[in-house]
């Protein structure tokens, strides 16, 4: 393996519950050690690895002897709180076989949404990697309510890849990659080896199916792939049980589905906008505004806003959607929902007289916006 010729410096590996449990109800440590071996080999060859691991809830169930618990958020938090310590213990022991230390980062949406916390998380990741320690990331399920949850580890791993400026994201799951329909329900489904563009027809293929203990299925993997490739990060979706899968993916061998990265990655501030999540609010845009924003690279003005959805403060990241609810851009609002409700459809010149102040003509400035 000549990794110096490959060119990847930093790789994020995401392991789904389906991989960690091998489809059973418990952590498959025999398989985890094999994955740790491959990641350790990369670290020793000079390729830095960040591990994004699911499996806390499954590990919690196993550790407590499969208790009968109602399917509530609080009970999932209980299972994650118990299971996360088992999970990190397992990884710490398995990597120690290869002489490597691990460091744990449990993140929530809020850590990615707030610029200062985002930069702090980035510093921690870099400090670990600069010292040859493998960062192990999971969502902080025990404290995350639905509002502050990223929600699935596919998205979390993409955001982590942006955070640490990785150049490859490997999403490992229980299928060989992305198929043209769900291989669980269609045995004739065909593997898609290369994806250059992610559009609505591709999203439809991903459907909603999820393996036994997993969250999100292929749909969240596609979302993750889209976030990463926009930031100039290549993505591979492959089977976590394929022999040498991590090493082969890093050596650019033909494994699973490969997503080409966009050539002009977004600058860092736009990456941060994409790394956070537009959780709190939406603006519905008229046709002219959609065109101005998506085709002409303009800022969004109040005149082009048809309606405001949700309650939010100034400085919140919003989804900019069309009348069918399709998201066309994401950006930071210069006005609160309350203010926006007073100025929708109005000319920018009227803002000061309507509000008694103004924060500029743009409701969402183009420097604070990512067109999707
Ligand atoms: N087009 C598709 N190609 C591959 N898998 C798909 C597709 N559509 C849905 N799936 C489902 O997605 C599942 C993997 O997602 P998930 O259960 O969340 O796994 P993980 O725990 O690895 O994140 C597969 O088992 C498969 O049934
Ligand atoms: N944070 C959760 C996993 C959430 C998740 O996205 O799971 P998966 O679809 O298996 O990657 C856990 O550790 O159990």
Curated annotation (Swiss-Prot):
Location of the PUA domain: 280-358
Pathway the protein contributes to: Amino-acid biosynthesis; L-proline biosynthesis; L-glutamate 5-semialdehyde from L-glutamate: step 1/2
SUPFAM superfamilies, per database record: Carbamate kinase-like, PUA domain-like
GO process annotations (BP): L-proline biosynthetic process
HAMAP family from the UniProt entry: ProB
GO cellular component: cytosol
Similarity field: Belongs to the glutamate 5-kinase family.
Protein name: Glutamate 5-kinase
GO terms for MF: ATP binding; glutamate 5-kinase activity; RNA binding
Group of enzyme by EC: transferase
Keywords for the protein's UniProt record, in alphabetical order: Amino-acid biosynthesis, ATP-binding, Cytoplasm, Kinase, Nucleotide-binding, Proline biosynthesis, Transferase
Residues reported in the UniProt entry to bind ATP: 14, 173-174, 215-221
Purpose of the protein: Catalyzes the transfer of a phosphate group to glutamate to form L-glutamate 5-phosphate.
Coiled coil: none
Species per Swiss-Prot/TrEMBL record: Shewanella woodyi (strain ATCC 51908 / MS32)
Catalytic activity, EC: 2.7.2.11
Localization annotation: Cytoplasm
Electron transport in keyword set: no
UniProt KW Cell cycle keyword: no
Catalytic activity: L-glutamate + ATP = L-glutamyl 5-phosphate + ADP
UniProt binding sites for substrate: 54, 141, 153
């Amino acid at each position: 393996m000549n990794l110096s010729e490959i060119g990847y410096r930093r790789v994020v590996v995401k392991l789904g519950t389906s991989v960690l449990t091998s489809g059973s109800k418990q952590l498959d440590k025999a398989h985890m050690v094999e994955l740790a071996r491959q990641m350790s080999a990369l670290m020793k060859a000079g390729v830095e690895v960040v591990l994004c691991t699911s499996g806390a809830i499954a590990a919690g169930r196993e550790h407590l002897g499969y208790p009968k618990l109602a399917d509530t958020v609080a009970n999932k938090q209980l299972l994650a709180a118990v299971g996360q310590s088992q999970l990190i213990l397992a990884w710490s022991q398995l990597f120690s076989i290869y002489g490597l230390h691990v460091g744990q980062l449990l993140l929530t949406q809020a850590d990615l949404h707030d610029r200062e916390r985002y930069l702090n998380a980035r510093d921690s990741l870099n400090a670990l990697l600069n010292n040859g320690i493998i960062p192990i990331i999971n969502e902080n399920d025990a404290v995350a309510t639905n509002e502050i949850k990223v929600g699935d580890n596919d998205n979390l791993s993409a955001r982590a890849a942006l955070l640490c400026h990785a150049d490859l994201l490997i999403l490992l799951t229980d299928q060989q990659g992305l198929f043209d329909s769900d291989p669980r329900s269609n045995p004739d489904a065909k593997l898609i080896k290369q994806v250059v563009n992610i559009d609505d027809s591709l999203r439809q293929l991903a459907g909603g199916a999820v393996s036994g203990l997993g969250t999100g299925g292929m749909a969240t993997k596609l979302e993750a792939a889209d976030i990463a490739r926009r930031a100039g990060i290549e993505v591979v979706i492959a089977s976590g049980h394929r022999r040498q899968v991590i090493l082969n993916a890093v050596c650019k061998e033909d494994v699973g589905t490969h997503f080409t990265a966009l050539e002009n990655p977004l600058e860092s501030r736009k990456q941060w906008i994409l790394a956070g999540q537009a959780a709190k609010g939406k603006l519905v845009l008229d046709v002219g505004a959609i065109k101005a924003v998506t085709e002409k690279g303009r800022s969004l003005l109040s005149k082009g806003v048809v309606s405001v959805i949700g309650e939010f403060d100034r400085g919140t990241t919003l989804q900019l959607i069309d009348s069918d609810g399709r998201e066309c851009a994401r950006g930071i609002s210069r006005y609160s929902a309350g203010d926006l409700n007073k100025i929708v459809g109005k000319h920018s010149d009227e803002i000061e007289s309507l509000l008694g102040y103004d924060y500029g003509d743009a409701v969402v400035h183009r420097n604070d916006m990512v067109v999707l």
